Amino acid sequence: MRRNEYTHRRRHISNRHLSDKYYYAGEHETATGIRLTQYNEQSLHTKEVRITDTSFSKLSDPDQINWFEVSGLTNADAITRIVKDFGLHNLDAKDILTPQHVVKVEEYKGRMLIVLNSCYYDVNNEMRSEHISILVANNTVITFTESNNPVFEAAHKALLSNMLNIRKKGSGLLLAFLLNTIIANLVESASKVEEILEDIEETLLDPKNDQGNMGSLIQQHRHEYMIIRKNSLPLKDQFSKLLRTENGIITPDILPIYNDLQDQLQFVIQTTESCREITSSLVDLYISNNDLRMNAIMKRLTIVSTLFIPLTFLVGVWGMNFKIMPELDWRYGYFIAWAVMIATGVLTWLYICLLYTSDAADD
């Protein structure tokens, strides 16, 4: 095991114990950076915040919505200070620093913590999973991501275009856009896996196609849809809890947006169920195709061995070279032997063809 993998695993185990100090237990090495976006109906501006300026209560403007984007979780001390400054417990910092933590929604007085995992396909068409946490208050939103990938680029575009009058609304609508980005990635990933599995099914149904690596592809995409299901199913359960919160963040006028997000989550879960059924049928189909190919190979081997059994017998008899073998002294004995073997092979071949033709007619 490589050293960094051992370190991540050791830190992950350490985070499972009660402590006053926790570590980032993921694999990303992104340095912790903070970007602050402040907006209201009249203005919108973004700036970088130094990692030492983690007193967000002083940086926040009460007349604007303050969105702090924390990218990179390697500076665990800074993350812990941010959480404490937000009025939460050390254990909440542990949840933020521990990737693949169970999805949860925790409601506090006037604030809320959402811990979840997102997955998406990168530029190399490989599925990636990222641990994301969101702290929300009336006029403050703090997002924590493992890397500096533009996970919430769609939310920034919505702010620039003032989509759905987002700059006029409170932090609840910004939270809806953030969750929409995460759920949209789940929808896109689930739909892509389903499409790939359907393409594999078409390949397996056509015996002319090369099916050499189909087994590994089925296993790979089975693992991918399991990741999606693992991230979406708990989120749907916690989403109902999110809609029942009474901290005033999710106001009645934006509740339909959250209901739509819940419908999208239901679509993701239904798609993963479809992927599960397709994968199960693909495994059966792949095994069946392997059996058919094995039967075809055995059939060819049987034909070859049947052809050579009588020829081997004749060659074995004439190869004994006993003194009393009249055909050895015949003038044309060699040519007669060849003629007998060729005739035997041809007759055997005709018999095999006739036999398989009659079997096919019976079927």
Named regions from a protein language model:
Residues 1-244, 249-251, 257-260, 264-269, ...:
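Peripheral, non-transmembrane regulatory/ligand-interaction domains of membrane transport proteins
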Residues 84, 316, 353:
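Short polybasic/polar patches that bind polyanions
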Residues 266-305:
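Membrane-interface, cytosolic juxtamembrane amphipathic helix immediately N-terminal to a transmembrane helix
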Residues 356-363:
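Conserved small/polar residues in nucleotide/adenosyl-binding loops
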Residues 293-326, 335-345:
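Bilayer-spanning, highly hydrophobic alpha-helical transmembrane segments
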Residues 348-355:
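Membrane-helix cytosolic exit motif
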Residues 287, 322-325, 354:
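Juxtamembrane transmembrane-helix termini
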